[in-house]
């Protein structure tokens, strides 16, 4: 892999890759794009008989996704399904409003370079922008709409068609067991110094199986879910400022809607963020929760079962607890998973999530009322 941040059209490495995709015109340049930490991403600019066209070239990170081929099959199934649904709604060119794969000249979904790395090409959606944090209440509403719209579009797509590319992801009891294992075999001085955090986990242990028990009892269905519904994965239209689509689809796989809703609210309705410096400022913003839930249920309410809707508020607690114990377990094990910026970073992250969970618990009755009101507006 070359290290330069920008390549000319004559660069042999990218020229070879790009030339294998079925694209019109001539590539003028390709430069690194975005701030993503997972995949190498390049914006490719083409001249098609005087018309400028843009595409996104990405290398799939095989160290994160051990089966890139399965990731690509999932992405192809989901994007293909969404494109068909949008065309049925009368949208002539869905590539303008949703991610879609550009095939290779051999009609493949991706190609492999000489090192075995997987590469794929997407359309570039010029009419949309993403934001790293929630701008205002209207933006929070559109985040909810974007997530609900995505889930609605794939609600009739069988999750059996998708690979489980991240086994065990969002299965909270698994993360609780990893925490328990870390208490037995972790860094001793870190174990000794986190008595208060360990006690917090013990007091909330009953949260771990809440969602998995619903899955096991088949009270809620497995569906196609996004699994990474953070703020900057909901693209906003530049003109209308409405949700356009969800991007970054590598994590799509079978799951339950609560994984997405709970994580979306946890991340978007915490204005101080995961690295808040002052724990006393960490709290759930119920105004943002109401906006997210209102937008989400406007789009998703029609296909959700009553049991699914009823369980939405508690999912925010479960997912927040889950992330907190993941941070704490990683700290106890010596920071082997999450990237850190300073020695106690993961411990601080865990404390932020636990503080947020306390706020969610204190607001649970109101949160449940907000979801109920959004699900059944007057």
What are these regions (language model features)?
Residues 218, 232-273:
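Catalytic activation segment of kinase domains across protein kinase-like and atypical kinase folds
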Residues 309-319:
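Small/polar glycine-rich anion-binding or flexible loop at a beta-alpha turn
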Residues 106-112, 210-212, 328:
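A short, acidic/glycine-rich surface segment
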Residues 5, 31-35, 56-59, 65-69, ...:
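ATP-dependent phospho-/nucleotidyl transfer catalytic cores
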Residues 360-363:
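Long, compositionally biased intrinsically disordered regions
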Residues 258-302, 318-337:
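Active-site activation/catalytic loop segments of kinase-like enzymes and analogous catalytic loops
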Residues 29-33, 37-47, 51-184, 257, ...:
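Conserved ATP-binding subdomain of kinase catalytic cores across diverse folds
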Residues 1-31:
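Juxta-kinase regulatory segment immediately upstream of eukaryotic protein kinase catalytic domains
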């Amino acid at each position: 892999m070359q290290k330069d941040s920008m390549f000319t059209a004559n660069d042999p490495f990218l020229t070879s890759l790009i030339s294998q995709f079925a694209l019109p015109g001539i590539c003028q340049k390709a430069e690194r794009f975005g701030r993503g930490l997972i995949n190498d991403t390049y914006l490719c600019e083409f001249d098609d008989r005087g018309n400028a066209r843009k595409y996104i070239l990405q290398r799939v990170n095989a160290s994160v996704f051990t089966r890139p081929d399965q990731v690509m099959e999932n992405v192809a199934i989901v994007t293909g399904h969404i494109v068909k649904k949008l065309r049925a709604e009368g949208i002539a060119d869905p590539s303008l409003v949703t991610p879609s794969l550009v095939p290779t000249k051999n009609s493949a979904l991706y190609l492999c370079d000489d090192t075995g790395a997987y590469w794929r090409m997407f359309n570039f959606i010029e009419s949309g922008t993403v934001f790293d944090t929630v701008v205002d209440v209207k933006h929070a509403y559109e985040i909810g709409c974007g997530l609900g719209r995505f889930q609605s579009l794939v609600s009739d797509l069988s999750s059996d068609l998708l690979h489980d590319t991240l086994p065990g992801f969002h299965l909270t009891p698994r993360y609780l067991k990893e925490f328990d294992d870390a208490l037995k075999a972790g860094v001793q001085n870190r174990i000794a110094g986190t008595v208060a955090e360990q006690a917090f986990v013990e007091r909330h242990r009953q949260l771990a199986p809440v969602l998995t028990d619903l899955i096991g009892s088949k009270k809620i269905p497995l569906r196609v879910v996004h699994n990474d519904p953070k703020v900057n994965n909901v693209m906003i239209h530049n003109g209308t400022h409405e949700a356009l689509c969800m991007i970054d689809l590598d994590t799509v796989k079978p799951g339950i809607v609560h994984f997405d809703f709970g994580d979306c609210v946890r991340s978007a309705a915490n204005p101080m963020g995961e690295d808040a410096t002052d724990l006393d400022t960490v709290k759930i913003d119920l105004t943002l929760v109401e906006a997210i839930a209102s937008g989400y249920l406007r789009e998703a309410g029609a296909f959700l079962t009553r049991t699914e809707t009823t369980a939405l508020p508690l999912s925010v607690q479960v997912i927040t607890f889950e992330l907190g114990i993941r941070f704490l377990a990683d700290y106890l094990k010596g920071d082997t998973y999450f990237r850190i910026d300073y020695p106690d970073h993961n411990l601080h992250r865990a404390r932020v999530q636990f503080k947020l969970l306390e706020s969610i618990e204190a607001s649970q009755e109101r949160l449940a009322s907000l979801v109920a009101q959004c699900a059944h507006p007057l």
